[in-house]
Amino acid sequence: MTEVRAGVDDVDRRLVELLGRRFGYMDAAARIKPDREAVRDEWRKADVLAKVDSAAAELGVDRKLMARIYEDLIETSIAHEMDEFDRTRA
């Protein structure tokens, strides 16, 4: 069990690093977008979800699970980007 937990801890650390990079891109997007309404882009959301679904299918990962996780991640990202948009224009 110790090895399993160590493996999970390693994956979690990598995920935190990758999510930090992802949110850095959200910060950049918030600075680039011309207005707050541009932050929520339903076409882009659908595109990301489709790419994740394709990657999950290719890698043999549970597609429904990935869809749920990414739905939450995208909504959290949008909220973060809106906050960053507001902060940079205050």
Over which residues does each language-model region extend?
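Domain-level signature for soluble enzymes in the chorismate/prephenate branch of the shikimate pathway
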Residues: 1-90
